[in-house]
Amino acid sequence: MIKITFPDGNFREYEAGITGWDIAGSISPRLQQDVLAAGVNGQVWDLHRPINEDAEVKLFKWDDAEGKHAFWHSSAHLMAEALEELYPGIKFGIGPAIENGFYYDVDPGEGISIKDADLPAIEKRMQDLAARKETIIRRDIAKADALRMFGDKDDQYKVELISELADGTITTYTQGGFTDLCRGPHLPNTGYIKAIKLLSVAGAYWRGDEKRKQLTRIYGISFPKKKMLDEYLELLEEAKKRDHRKIGKELELFAFSQNVGAGLPLWLPRGTQLRLRLEDFLKQIQKHFGYQQVITPHIGNKNLYITSGHYAKYGQDSFRPINTPQEGEEFMLKPMNCPHHCEIFKITPHSYRDLPIRLAEFGTVYRYEQSGELHGLTRVRGFTQDDAHLFCRPDQLKEEFCKVMDIIFIIFKALDFKNFEAQISLRDKVNREKYIGSEENWERAERAIIEACEEKGLPAVIEYGEAAFYGPKLDFMVKDALGRRWQLGTIQVDYNLPERFDLEYTGEDNKKHRPVMIHRAPFGSMERFVAVLIEHTAGKFPLWLTPDQVVVLPVSERFNEYAHRVAKELNQRDIRVQVDDRNEKVGRKIRDNELKRIPYMLIVGENESREEEVSVRKQGEGDMGIMKITTFAELIEKEVDDMISAWRKDYQN
């Protein structure tokens, strides 16, 4: 008999060779119906894989990320099986599960292309194969046999992948007449897949290398129920309406120019106003928390990034070094701000009394992204991080960590991100040798993060083995208005850079000590954060943040002068206002400015100009009646003051 321990600490004994499927059935028929994969001692297994020794077991359903992963991974194989039947001789690259669905990179063959118009036929074949409920079989075979198998099919991509694996056994999965190289896990059979939608076709270079062949990437998604697919497709349609690229163009926030270069956004006047207000908002909070603003160059000597380790990590993702013709020095576009901040810390000797030192910068950094990977503001080649680096004593780590968490909470509240969760990334429990820093420092840092989350009442998932080699971290994932998860806000403890840059302070014992470094970026990057904010709000920004708070609409040209007088009076009270004095009917002006998401519209005509009044319309609410100009101005000022006071109160308490 073997002992199976469950997540709640309870255990049962079973015959050796029991499977996750059998364990689920021993608990309840409903669980056996819903379970998709099994966690065995921290690894995700197929449900029908035998368990032959004592183990900790967790059963994963659709609501678990591991369950979805197995489901979508099997769906990728189902698509590959359909493609092999429809396109004889097709070659396969990789086909993973991703956050929302799956894809497969394929080479259809010389002169053959797969386009969006072909997706319905592929989808139909997948549905037919799923209906057969083909058993998915896992096999362990020798590496030589795997090379022979895929070599006989002339599948050079699989042969290349297998050649790079260590000698020994290779895992394959078979369903029907299709076999694929794969670690798994997978569903028991294809019948679990009830609803399928292939979404799009794109190009992708083999192994991400622009010098290699461009393959065809087919994206799809699948569900265990048709109703789930219908709901997802509705969500997808709403997401298209909220696409930050579409709204950014409509609101004239940002643009791209091929003459400037792909992945290099141009911030237009209205977008610049929005971004600067976000920056000012964070600067006010940082000032309260004792941060000092710094500015560093856009380039740095290559040796700086060799010292920091960023050249080794980001060298392939960086633009080529800039060579000075006379001195022969090499400079790089800055890939990260932290090495520069370390150099600022080193300029002045520090005592233990000086710490913590908090350096903040809206610093622009540059990474080379392949053109096919660029996407609006969320994936660019030049972006500005709301970066800060804190240098503190080990005994100050927890307190400083809590304060950074407070800053992130204030930002999320002010911008209406109500639903968020956190992940604590800690060391691998077993392989400790791959981490730098003393055991004592690591334990202190990990304990500080866990206790900080407990003190703040923040539920957090702990992931072992996810920490960087130089320290543990806390990541925040927010859910937007459509329920999509975005990673926003990171707090990272770092023992590496203080060592690399030989940072030190004089302790109370008059000896030299290493500071602990904290990296933090609540927004992450301004570009990506603005993209998420646009899609979360559908471009309807809070009144304190929106580029234009008011637009004045004269009903005819006769009242343009009065409209500009109203605008001038509001401008004098720091209310952001525009005048739409186009020679158009007022109904057209109202519709156009509704699309621009301007919160308030003031309509002025004969009566309003005579009485020194305005007719007020609020975005999404309609007519608010006639008001004196001063009354309306006071209404705006109070609404903004109430919003600002709410988040100021949070950090002043």
Curated annotation (Swiss-Prot):
SMART domains: tRNA_SAD. Its EC number is 6.1.1.3. It catalyses: tRNA(Thr) + L-threonine + ATP = L-threonyl-tRNA(Thr) + AMP + diphosphate + H(+). Belongs to the class-II aminoacyl-tRNA synthetase family. It comes from the Bacteria. Its cofactor is Zn(2+). Binds 1 zinc ion per subunit. Keywords: Aminoacyl-tRNA synthetase, ATP-binding, Cytoplasm, Ligase, Metal-binding, Nucleotide-binding, Protein biosynthesis, RNA-binding, tRNA-binding, Zinc. Catalyzes the attachment of threonine to tRNA(Thr) in a two-step reaction: L-threonine is first activated by ATP to form Thr-AMP and then transferred to the acceptor end of tRNA(Thr). Also edits incorrectly charged L-seryl-tRNA(Thr). Homodimer. Residues 1-61 form the TGS domain. Residues 243-542 are annotated as: Catalytic. The keyword Zinc applies. It is found in: Cytoplasm. This is Threonine--tRNA ligase. Zn(2+) binds at residues 338, 389, 519. One of its GO terms (cellular component) is cytoplasm. Disulfide bonds: none annotated. One of its GO terms (molecular function) is ATP binding. One of its GO terms (biological process) is threonyl-tRNA aminoacylation. The gene is thrS. PROSITE patterns: AA_TRNA_LIGASE_II, TGS.
